[in-house]
From Swiss-Prot:
It catalyses: alpha-D-glucosamine 1-phosphate = D-glucosamine 6-phosphate. It is an enzyme of class 5 (isomerase). The keyword Phosphoprotein applies. It comes from Pseudomonas aeruginosa (strain LESB58). SUPFAM superfamilies: Phosphoglucomutase, C-terminal domain, Phosphoglucomutase, first 3 domains. Keywords: Isomerase, Magnesium, Metal-binding, Phosphoprotein. The gene is glmM. GO terms for biological process: carbohydrate metabolic process; peptidoglycan biosynthetic process; UDP-N-acetylglucosamine biosynthetic process. This is Phosphoglucosamine mutase.
Length: 445
């Protein structure tokens, strides 16, 4: 059954435009409360990133929960994986994240965790959608939900992050630059790395409600690259606005993406005898990752794009490590969702075990040239179903003669078609990608 409101990761859009409006979010809070109250008493955690609109939507969602009779625990600004962790430790029925991740401040969204800190099952999302289309009722006054604030939420999550590495860990002598994207990690990440002994320089840690992801964070690495070189740092770490994506920069200023970080963690786990099963990537994972893992005899499978699908594949196979090239990395031995801070700590441990710099360690993987072009579209029609697009995709695949991949897919969070071509020669890969993107653009027009 198709979803009316939920995308691949909750509900997201432009602030003030349906469904990201206060009245809809209030009804959404009520629907969530009603769905979980069917199982008995209900407590729901709410956390958010640093967008100014987050306060408005927090109040609206909280009001809806109260109307349903569900209690609310407010965390304040908190990385998405921190909300997943605290939902588990507080034994709440659900966790709510008010965030649009790596998007600009004028977008926002709502995503959810189950009481186990995992994405909501499909049947629960469908139940919430049914309730959204039902008349809203309010419980009697004596049964209205109560609201309380968790004042030590940040400290709890900091200690959890530190517990993901051995207690003897000491990063003394390591110079690190952190880019916090003016987002949810702005206080927590510097504390974690400093308390573990690293010398930390911090960028983009002064949120004002409007500057989240603004020319900073994991999707805008120029500032971090320059700062790493300027400060003679060993490496740089960039988070996105809600702290579930991580990208890194080596001491030369070269970018190290999610595929490379995933490889470094997998190799370290294998070398220390801690790797369980194989690695889950996605349709967008670079072919070079697959080949590098193959050389180490580490199994590799591809899930659909989106960390919920990576997590589902990990659970189905009872494996422990997966991720996306965008920097969503799931380490199941520590977390139930992508956690940027914990993933970064695992990479630092891998470097420490090998006695290598990030620049040296990344030589174990040779990425294949990959070109990704985003094409914006309007309307309800699916450009990928157009005969011209299908024919062009088949033609380009045949022209590559089995030495590359073509992937066309719609974004689950934005009105975009992603055109990805991968092969062994960059000029031809770019030419093929531009050719396909041109055809998709013409169809979308």
């Amino acid at each position: 059954m198709s979803r009316k409101y939920f995308g691949t990761d909750g509900i997201r859009g432009r602030v003030g435009e349906f469904p990201i409006t206060p009245d809809f979010v209030l009804k959404l809070g009520w629907a969530v409360g009603m769905a979980f109250r069917r199982q008995g008493n209900c407590r729901v955690l709410i956390g958010k990133d640093t967008r100014s609109s987050g306060y408005m939507f927090e109040s609206a969602f909280e009001a809806g929960l109260s109307a349903s009779g569900a209690d609310t625990l407010l965390l304040g600004p908190m990385p998405t994986p921190g909300i997943a962790y605290l939902t588990r430790t507080f034994h709440a029925e659900a966790g709510v994240v008010i965030s649009a991740s790596h998007n600009p401040h004028d977008d926002n969204g709502i995503k959810f965790f189950s009481g186990q800190g995992t994405k909501l099952p499909d049947d629960v999302e469908l139940m919430i959608e049914e309730l959204l289309d039902a008349p809203m009722t309010v419980v009697e006054s004596a049964r209205l939900g109560k609201v309380s604030r968790i004042n030590d939420a940040a400290g709890r999550y900091i200690e959890f992050c530190k517990s993901s590495v051995p207690t003897s860990t000491d990063f003394n002598g390591l110079k690190v630059v952190l880019d916090c994207a003016n987002g949810a990690t702005y206080k927590i990440a510097p504390s974690v790395f400093r308390e573990l002994g690293a010398e930390v320089t911090v960028l983009a840690a002064s949120p004002n409600g409007l500057n989240i992801n603004d020319k900073c964070g994991s999707t805008h690495l120029d500032g971090l690259q320059a700062a790493v070189v300027e400060h003679h740092a060993d490496l740089g770490i960039a988070f996105d606005g809600d702290g579930d994506r991580v990208m890194m920069v080596d001491h030369t200023g070269a970018v190290v993406d999610g595929d490379e970080l995933l490889f470094l963690i997998a190799r370290d786990l294998q070398e220390s005898g801690r790797l369980q099963g194989g690695v889950v990537g996605t349709l967008m994972s670079n072919l070079g990752l697959e080949l590098a893992l193959q050389e180490l005899h580490i199994p590799f499978v591809r899930a659909k794009v989106g960390d919920r699908y990576v997590m589902a594949e990990l659970l189905a196979r009872n494996w422990m490590l997966g991720g996306e090239n965008s920097g969503h990395i799931v380490c199941c031995q520590n977390t139930t969702t992508g956690d940027a801070i914990i993933a970064a700590l695992q990479v630092l441990m891998a470097l420490k075990h090998r006695g290598q710099t990030l620049a040296e360690a990344r030589q174990g993987i040779r990425k294949c040239p990959q070109v990704l072009i985003n094409v914006r579209f309007k309307g309800e029609s699916d450009p990928l179903e157009h005969p011209s697009v299908k024919e062009a995709s088949v033609r380009v695949t045949e022209q590559m003669g089995g030495r590359g991949r073509v992937l066309l897919r719609k974004s689950g969070t934005e009105p975009l078609v992603r055109v990805m071509v991968e092969g062994d020669e960059e000029a031809s890969v770019r030419a093929h990608a531009e050719q396909l993107a041109k055809i998709v653009s013409e169809v979308c027009a």
